[in-house]
């Protein structure tokens, strides 16, 4: 499956993204990569951020960029936020994870299960969050949180995914809420999976996990095991995923990215209209 890895970053996040991009290549992942940044990166096809797309704090800009990318000739588009790091090449290809479904994000932790210990997600009480999902069309018995930093979309589903994500934004705003994009991403994984259990995070702990508690604080992941805590249940497990969402390693990733750019200064941006040929190596 022809796959494009893509991301968007600005400010210090572009240095984190530079560190991520190098880690992807260093472990031997060969999929094409496209970035949108406020200054060029090195070692990847780098386009300037689209000034027509508002980089809103709640990050619904991700859906606008997804819609923008649908003109590119790829089968699968994999979004990875800048504060990630690859410690080895994943055993499963991205195409193996998405399977036959049009969309994937890891459904991490149950919101309305006997295992649930946390009383809210994004400040919304669990019962109210479940009701919000139900009102939008989610009908699975158990509803799960997700992480908005890593997800995949097939090309034929991109326009519908973007439309649905932005529709959910408006839906929850009409309910008096101001939730970030990852709630919409969770909704998509519930609604558009033939078997949503194939999205459950526990099936992919060796591929990806989010380090949000600070056990790797200010350190770049190095392939060692670390203690993962599931957000809603607070259950812990020792993990060593190939891809770490290193949420508490930002300062180390910034410094790493700066050093990479000093050693290998970036070239100019690739104009968006030339991105396809640049990715093809023409």
Locate each region found by the language model.
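Long, compositionally biased intrinsically disordered regions
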Residues: 226-282
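N-terminal anchoring/stem segment of glycosyltransferases
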Residues: 1-61, 68-75, 156, 191, ...
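Short, solvent-exposed loop/turn segments at secondary-structure junctions
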Residues: 10-12, 39-42, 84-86, 109-112, ...
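A conserved donor-nucleotide-binding helix/loop in the catalytic core
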Residues: 50-80, 86-92, 103, 146, ...
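Catalytic core and acceptor-binding pocket of nucleotide-sugar-dependent glycosyltransferases
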Residues: 133-249
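Conserved donor-nucleotide/metal-binding helix-loop-beta segment in metal-dependent transferases, i.e.
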Residues: 86-127
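Non-transmembrane alpha-helical segments in soluble domains
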Residues: 21, 25, 95, 162, ...
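Short His-Asn-centered micro-motif
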Residues: 6-10, 35-38, 80-82, 88, ...
């Amino acid at each position: 499956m022809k796959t494009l890895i893509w991301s968007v970053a600005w400010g210090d996040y572009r240095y984190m993204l530079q560190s991520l991009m190098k880690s992807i290549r260093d472990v031997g992942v060969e999929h094409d990569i496209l970035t949108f940044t406020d200054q060029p990166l090195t070692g990847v096809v780098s386009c300037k951020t689209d000034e027509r797309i508002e980089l809103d704090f709640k990050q619904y800009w991700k859906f606008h960029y997804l819609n923008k990318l649908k003109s590119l000739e790829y089968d699968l588009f994999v979004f990875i936020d800048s504060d990630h790091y690859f410690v080895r090449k994943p055993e499963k290809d991205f195409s193996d994870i998405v399977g036959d479904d049009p969309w994937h994000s890891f459904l991490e932790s149950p919101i309305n299960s006997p295992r649930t210990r946390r009383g809210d997600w994004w400040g919304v009480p669990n019962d109210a969050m479940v009701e919000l999902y139900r009102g939008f069309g989610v009908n699975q018995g158990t509803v799960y949180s997700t992480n908005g930093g890593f997800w995949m979309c097939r090309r034929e589903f991109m326009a519908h995914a973007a439309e649905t994500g932005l529709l959910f934004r408006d839906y929850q705003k009409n309910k008096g809420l101001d939730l970030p994009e990852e709630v919409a991403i969770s909704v998509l994984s519930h609604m558009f999976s033939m078997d949503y259990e194939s999205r459950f995070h526990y099936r992919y702990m060796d591929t990806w996990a989010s380090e949000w508690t600070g056990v790797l604080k200010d350190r770049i992941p190095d392939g060692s095991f670390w203690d993962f805590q599931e957000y809603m249940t607070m259950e812990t497990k020792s993990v060593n995923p190939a891809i770490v969402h290193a949420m508490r390693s930002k300062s180390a990733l910034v410094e790493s990215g700066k050093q990479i750019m000093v050693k290998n200064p970036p070239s100019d941006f690739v104009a968006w209209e030339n991105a396809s040929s640049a990715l093809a190596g023409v």
